[in-house]
Amino acid sequence: MSNETPQQPTPANELLEALGTTLSPDLLVQALTHRSFSHEHPGVANYERLEFLGDAVLELVSTETLFTIHPDMTEGQLAKMRAKAVSEDALSAIAKTKLKVGPYILLGHGEAEQGGAEKNSILCDIVESLIGATFLEHGIDEARKVIHRLIDDTLAEVATEGPALDWKTSLTVKAHGLGKEEPVYHMEVSGPEYAQIFTARVSLGENGDIIGIGKGSSKRKAQLAAAEAGWKSLDSFKTRTK
């Protein structure tokens, strides 16, 4: 394969309109260039440095926003909300639904054949690299506007989830608040090896009464389901004792 840099496509105006800013063509192309493409075309810069920068800017702005709009939340609650709002799942969904960036990502042949334009990890990286490019070209104020445009509805959504952000942690906190012992998860596995069903029963203390039961295709999913049931059980108990 030739090492000459190919004619690089300029993304459609719709992408920049969705992003809500402008970027120089060279910087925009870099923000969309995966390392597999630059490996096949030496001398073409990829998005990794921009992603590194964008990740830091995104963390700053999302933290600042949550800190401001939720003055009564603890550090732990804010950290959980931020983690979910800027998670790989959340950012890749933004890349797919808001930016529709997949067709514009520059990938090496192998990565393209493996569906790289639809991989959540790459889509997440692209969102961060575009934020980094915005910060580099326009500064923090413009980057802040872009971030709000992209994630404000996600921040609002996670704010309504409350304990659902982490049922196991939420159950532990509620149990401690009621003066109860630490939650203990008792596991059972059934079904053939290729289709195992995990059942978790959660009690407060090793020998306490079972307060929640959950099933799932993995130990983690079963424990989360049990923790949710246990949390709701304790929430009902707390309401009855008021």
From Swiss-Prot:
Q: Which reaction does it catalyse?
A: Endonucleolytic cleavage to 5'-phosphomonoester
Keywords of the record = Cytoplasm, Endonuclease, Hydrolase, Magnesium, Metal-binding, mRNA processing, Nuclease, RNA-binding, rRNA processing, rRNA-binding, tRNA processing
Give the matching CDD domains.
DSRM_RNAse_III_family, RIBOc
The family database entries (InterPro entries) matched by this protein are listed as: dsRBD_dom (IPR014720), RNase_III (IPR011907), RNase_III_dom (IPR000999), RNase_III_sf (IPR036389)
Instruction: Please give the SUPFAM superfamilies that the UniProt record associates with this protein.
Output: dsRNA-binding domain-like (SSF54768), RNase III domain-like (SSF69065)
Indicate where this protein resides in the cell: Cytoplasm
Cofactors (names): Mg(2+)
Record GO cellular component, one term: cytoplasm
The DRBM domain sits at 165-236
Chief localisation class: cytoplasm
Query: Molecular function (GO) terms listed?
Result: double-stranded RNA binding; metal ion binding; ribonuclease III activity; rRNA binding
Q: Where is the RNase III domain?
A: 12-139
Enzyme active site: D55, E128
Gene3D superfamilies from the xrefs? Answer: 3.30.160.20, Ribonuclease III domain
- PROSITE patterns, per the entry: DS_RBD, RNASE_3_1, RNASE_3_2
Main function:
Digests double-stranded RNA. Involved in the processing of primary rRNA transcript to yield the immediate precursors to the large and small rRNAs (23S and 16S). Processes some mRNAs, and tRNAs when they are encoded in the rRNA operon. Processes pre-crRNA and tracrRNA of type II CRISPR loci if present in the organism.
Subunit structure of this entry? Homodimer.
HAMAP family from the xrefs?
RNase_III (MF_00104)
User: Which PANTHER family does the record match to this protein?
Assistant: RIBONUCLEASE 3, RIBONUCLEASE III
Give the family from UniProt.
Belongs to the ribonuclease III family.
Q: What is this protein called?
A: Ribonuclease 3
**The organism of origin for this protein:** Bifidobacterium longum (strain NCC 2705)
Q: Which gene encodes it?
A: rnc
